[in-house]
């Protein structure tokens, strides 16, 4: 079959019309040197600090240093896949992570990719990991409580929604246990339909052992708390760059809840390892070291992260993001560089002491130097009614206790005060993974402060508390319900409680 010249011309015209002549302009550089997770790149003239670049192997890098003729990027992955001379492409993006309720119940890496083997995460929304913290006008004052379920904290060092409360102490003093207990304690609110009472939890493990993270996930699953929790893991075996990014990724996931009128709690476990990872990156980038070899912007590293926790104003949806950063001290030294930095950024600290822990006082909270700068604004009225004097009574007890070591003869008043203090300490003790509902905490503290334990032997105080709470749950549940619903102890409720306790104390002493 012969084609006429005019037909050939028509076919050629059609084909030419279908050709896509749009060419994409890519800015490409070249790796000059690579090592220790840092790549020095030549040729990316327009790249910005904090931008993501892509290496030939597909591994991504984060640009942190801009120099006269080159840029330095931290490699977010295996640096063995990046070779000298490799091309590096600018993708004109900053780091973003998936956010939303689809992540609840999952264990993810710093990029939001699932690492729990439960399939893909269907999240449609992405957020940048570095965003500006809410301004002054957008915020509201902290006025609603985050119930941790821990008597010593909810009564003496209350945490409010939108607060930043530091948990600080030596290793193995129960810092993570407090955080996990707080997550488990939110379960009751999630069984109800009222969205306002629900607090979604985010736990970010920075530089932890993989076995420790797995243990925490198993504990949360066993307690039925994983359904409202996201776990982000940047373990010790991962690159320092990933450990550095982890809290910012987690914070963006938490901000989704805050900005949509919901409430979230984020736990950074721990920021000491985060600071060490950033120090490693900074020294490899040849930034000048300062105190304890940390770079000069280490304060800004944590302040820009923790300032993102806030209680939003009504105009912004009244959501909140509460932060519980954890710091590990060396031999109880709270005056070291990172601890003092984070103490000055946060709205209070819960200080855990090894000495108390070894004495069997658990949670090992040192009430003397622990403080909540939000104070009783974050407590319900019923808790204020019973816990107002506890801190003072414990402080007086500590003073008298140290004084009594040198004095053999004590007058009856001092002896009674010491006995009362010992019983207060005993009633504030609590088993791990055993958070109490706030109404039961109030009854326990009421028993301690109103001196119902005077005739109960010290070693039987815990037994007394357990039996008393069991009895009140079974036969006097109306007292607990009244405290829970009214959020205060009415005269009628107090009268019922007094009658119940007087009868119960008599029966308990008689039985023992």
From Swiss-Prot:
GO CC annotation, single: plasma membrane
SUPFAM superfamilies in UniProt: C-terminal domain of alpha and beta subunits of F1 ATP synthase, N-terminal domain of alpha and beta subunits of F1 ATP synthase, P-loop containing nucleoside triphosphate hydrolases
Alphabetized GO MF terms: ADP binding; ATP binding; proton-transporting ATP synthase activity, rotational mechanism
Record field: catalytic activity: ATP + H2O + 4 H(+)(in) = ADP + phosphate + 5 H(+)(out)
EC number annotated for this UniProt entry: 7.1.2.2
Location relative to the cell: Cell inner membrane
Highest taxon of the lineage: Bacteria
PANTHER family named in the record: ATP SYNTHASE SUBUNIT ALPHA, MITOCHONDRIAL
Functional summary from the UniProt entry: Produces ATP from ADP in the presence of a proton gradient across the membrane. The alpha chain is a regulatory subunit.
Subunit note: F-type ATPases have 2 components, CF(1) - the catalytic core - and CF(0) - the membrane proton channel. CF(1) has five subunits: alpha(3), beta(3), gamma(1), delta(1), epsilon(1). CF(0) has three main subunits: a(1), b(2) and c(9-12). The alpha and beta chains form an alternating ring which encloses part of the gamma chain. CF(1) is attached to CF(0) by a central stalk formed by the gamma and epsilon chains, while a peripheral stalk is formed by the delta and b chains.
Protein name according to UniProt: ATP synthase subunit alpha
Native species: Rickettsia canadensis (strain McKiel)
Gene name, Swiss-Prot/TrEMBL: atpA
């Amino acid at each position: 079959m012969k084609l006429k010249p005019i037909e050939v011309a028509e076919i050629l015209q059609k084909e030419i019309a279908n050709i896509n002549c749009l060419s994409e302009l890519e800015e490409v550089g070249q790796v000059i040197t690579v090592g220790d997770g840092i790549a020095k790149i030549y040729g990316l003239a327009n790249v910005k600090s904090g931008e993501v670049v892509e290496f030939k192997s597909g591994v991504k890098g984060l640009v942190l240093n801009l120099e006269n003729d080159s840029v330095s990027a931290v490699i977010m992955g295996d640096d063995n896949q990046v070779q000298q001379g490799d091309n590096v492409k600018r993708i004109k993006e900053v780091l973003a992570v998936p956010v939303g309720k689809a992540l609840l119940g999952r264990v993810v890496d710093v990029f939001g990719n699932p690492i729990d083997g439960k399939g893909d995460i269907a999240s449609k929304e992405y957020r940048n990991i570095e965003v500006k913290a809410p301004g002054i006008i957008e915020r509201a004052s902290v006025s609603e409580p985050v119930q941790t379920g821990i008597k010593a904290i909810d009564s003496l060092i209350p945490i409010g929604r939108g607060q930043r409360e530091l948990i600080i102490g030596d290793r193995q003093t129960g810092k993570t246990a407090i955080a996990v207990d707080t997550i488990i304690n939110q379960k009751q609110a999630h069984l109800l339909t009222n969205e306002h009472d629900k607090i979604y939890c985010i736990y970010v493990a920075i530089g932890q052992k993989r076995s420790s993270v797995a243990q925490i996930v198993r504990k949360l699953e066993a307690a039925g708390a994983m359904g409202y929790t996201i776990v982000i893991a940047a373990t010790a075996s991962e690159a320092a760059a990933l450990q550095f990014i982890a809290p910012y990724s987690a914070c963006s996931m938490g901000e989704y809840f805050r900005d949509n009128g919901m409430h979230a709690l984020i736990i950074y476990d721990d920021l000491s390892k985060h600071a060490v990872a950033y120090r490693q990156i900074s020294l490899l980038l040849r930034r000048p070291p300062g105190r304890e070899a940390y770079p000069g912007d280490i304060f800004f590293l944590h302040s820009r992260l923790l300032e993102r926790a806030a209680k939003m104003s009504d105009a912004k949806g009244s959501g909140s993001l509460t932060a519980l950063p954890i710091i590990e001290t060396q031999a109880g030294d709270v005056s070291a560089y990172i601890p003092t930095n984070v103490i000055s950024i946060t709205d209070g600290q819960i200080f855990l002491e090894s000495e108390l822990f070894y004495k069997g006082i658990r949670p090992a909270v040192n009430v003397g130097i622990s403080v909540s700068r939000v104070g009783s604004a974050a407590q319900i009225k019923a808790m204020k009614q019973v816990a107002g004097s506890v801190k003072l009574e414990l402080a007086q007890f500590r003073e008298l206790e140290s004084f009594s070591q040198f004095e053999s003869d004590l007058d009856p008043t001092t002896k009674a005060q010491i006995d009362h203090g010992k019983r207060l300490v005993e009633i504030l003790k609590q088993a791990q993974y055993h958070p109490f509902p706030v109404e039961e905490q109030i009854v326990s503290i009421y028993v301690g402060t109103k001196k119902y334990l005077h005739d109960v032997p010290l070693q039987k105080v815990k037994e007394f508390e357990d039996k008393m709470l069991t009895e009140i749950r079974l036969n006097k549940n109306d007292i607990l319900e009244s405290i829970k619903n009214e959020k205060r102890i009415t005269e009628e409720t107090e009268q019922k409680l007094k009658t119940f306790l007087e009868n119960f104390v008599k029966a308990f002493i008689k039985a023992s």
